[in-house]
Amino acid sequence: VLSPADKANVKAAWDKVGGQAGDYGAEALERMFLSFPTTKTYFPHFDLSHGSAQVKAHGKKVGDALSNAAGHLDDLPGALSALSDLHAYKLRVDPVNFKLLSHCLLVTLASHHAAEFTPAVHASLDKFLASVGTVLTSKYR
């Protein structure tokens, strides 16, 4: 559960991300594919090379979804319901992959916003991404 301080940290961090959410999403996907090659199996139809238009487009979807979630911290299940359905019923993504992508997102955010990435912000963003992952995997049961 996100505390009021966590919510404030997430909102402040996401305000700094701003219009770069899609770029950060694409960078995090690239990090994930390089660090955890088994994740590539969900994207057999993608050109996974650096700077690929397909990775950038999917990164934008990731960034947009996280921006939506950051704007609805009090109702993540409602904000992410359609995405939860998509990943559980159609794409059938292994839930562990959300944790891997979350880790890569944290690394990406830390690399771009080192000064603002305090231990408290890190903890809040980690809790936020874990909450998003929990919602996205909630319909797997």
Swiss-Prot record:
Protein's organism: Macroderma gigas
Occurrences of domain Globin (ranges): 1-141
Tissue and organ distribution: Red blood cells.
A GO CC term assigned to this protein in UniProt: blood microparticle
Keywords for this protein: Acetylation, Heme, Iron, Metal-binding, Oxygen transport, Phosphoprotein, Transport
Family per similarity comment: Belongs to the globin family.
Keyword Metal-binding: yes
Protein known as: Hemoglobin subunit alpha-1/2
GO biological process, one term: hydrogen peroxide catabolic process
Biological classification of the source: Eukaryota, Metazoa, Chordata, Craniata, Vertebrata
